[in-house]
Amino acid sequence: MVLLMRGRVVRGGTLVGAAVLGLWAGPAGAAPTLPGQLTNGLQPVKECNKCHAFANSPETADQPLVTPVAWQASMMGSSARDPVFWAGVAIASQDAPGETAQCVRCHAPRAFVGGRDDAIAIEELLPDDLSGVDCELCHRLIEDAETPAGDARYAIDDVLGLDGDVPKRGPWDYQVGDPPKHGFAFDTYIGESRMCGTCHDVSTGQMRVDAGGSSLGVPFGEQRTYSEWLGSDFAKQGPEFKSCQDCHMPAVADVAGCAELESQGERHASGGRRHDLAGANRRMVELLKQVYGDAGEQAVPDVFFDVALGSIDRSLAAAATLEVSAPAEVDLGVGLTELAVKVTNNTGHKLPTGYSEGRVMWLEVIGRYGEQVVYSSGRWIDGQGLEGDLQQRTYEARAVEHASQVAFHLLRNNTWLVDSRIPPKGLKQGLETDPVGDRYALLADQTWPNFDAVSYGFPGTSVVDATPEDAGDDVMMLSVRLLYVMNTPEYVQFLADENAVNDAGQAVAELFAGLGPVVPLELAAWSQAVPLRGLMVPAPGSSSGEAGSESVGPTTGEGVGSSSGGGPASSSGGETTAASAGAETGQTGDGGGG
């Protein structure tokens, strides 16, 4: 690979090396970096902060803060601080002593390359290790074409540049304008999805087996986010192409590269990228803000956590689309029928994706008369989790150890009981990324659908008219929401109960308890008021409420939004709202349903 490189070094405010323009071949024979191999250690993040922390320009002051150091509050920047990670590592160390180095390799790269890869608790790390997946790791990564992506087998540049420093690698070549005050190398690899795949395909030491216990000849894929993208339409060059960075590091126009140029009003003509690296783990970011933010250890400013939370909200808002076809009216004597729901995955990977333990997405369907819930499926019960009704529609991947059928033990898992997560558009067949179970059917082009369609039906019931003298409020409010929870109460309790090594699991349980009840993330929502017929009139002298023997007959008011005819009303447009922060069974499906 021949790259264009310019570098200069400033020490003590004096320019000691002029800008150098030349051809730079880069390191040869790249291979995964192992503990103790680096001659030139990773520079601490605080050094990067000196130049790369700056406010938005006056023209963009009303936009989310774009400084790259806001990365610190992302889950990438918090990967080594994540208390759920360390609680899981402790249990993994019980299950497979000596095999947790790969966990540290991904979540705490500085600890790994520094020889602290045997750590099983956050207390065993050095302060600089806590910066997680940080500036120097990404900006010194070099492409290793021989090693397959995955399992954090990163190759870190350790070759000094012309200025006596290991160059920082990035997509700007500085043929025009002021170059940075550190060595740099123009390298497009940092903008490719394969770089993200370094850590976002993960296998364990177990071999995967099928439902009968027979080996499938491949390692157990704990997560395959990169492979999901690679097999989707998003990875194909063309109008639908999107890299990981396009979604998780959105482009911004007219941005400075450092604080000095920002203060001088200089901008980089080709713009830059946000470094928010947004995912969906909002509750964890809230927890980390309490522990490490301004009111806690003051390791990361609250303003950066606020940037991270806002970025998560925007990411969730674009993740999925709901389409609902509802009946024109509901007759309580007949029940709620013909409620059809379609969920479309707009992301470039399964929805949800990544680490699957303790994570579930589902549909909540509610039919209310006033404040009374008449029909429901997928209700979340505080402190317990999902109610578990027969029509509950979930999207999750559940793994177990085949021999014992024990769940949640990451390094013992070797088979998938189910993987009902929604595939990305155009996902090709492949053992490593196929759904597990009978939820989805291949489309005509032999790809998996990026949607799930399901129909709900509820039987007739009796409800007393709260205002028999007023037919204007004889209305049922129908609502459908796509909800998501990471770290379910069941999983958090598992982390606390199963840990015999240290108190990391109990600490996690206490931290989450301090946040209060779990509020599921809302990825998409739909609602519509329809006329309600068949309400029971209370007998004279009785109070309103559930119908009983004293009710004397139905009322037939039209209600708000009434319409004639009994056919379904398509309601997939204006009332579908985007995300706000804050069982495998189902009825009939079509296309992607089942």
Residue ranges and their predicted role:
Residues 16-18, 28:
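Cleavable N-terminal signal peptides
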Residues 31-32, 55-89, 119-450, 454-468, ...:
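Primarily the internal scaffold of c-type cytochrome electron-transfer domains
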Residues 30-61:
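N-terminal module-boundary/linker segments of secreted carbohydrate-active enzymes
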Residues 100, 105-117:
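Conserved, well-structured interaction surfaces
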Residues 28-30, 536-594:
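Ser/Thr-rich, Pro/Gly/Ala-heavy low-complexity intrinsically disordered linkers and tails
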Residues 2-16:
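Bacterial N-terminal signal peptides that target proteins for export
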Residues 41-46, 96, 100, 132, ...:
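Residues immediately within or flanking Cys/His clusters that coordinate Zn2+
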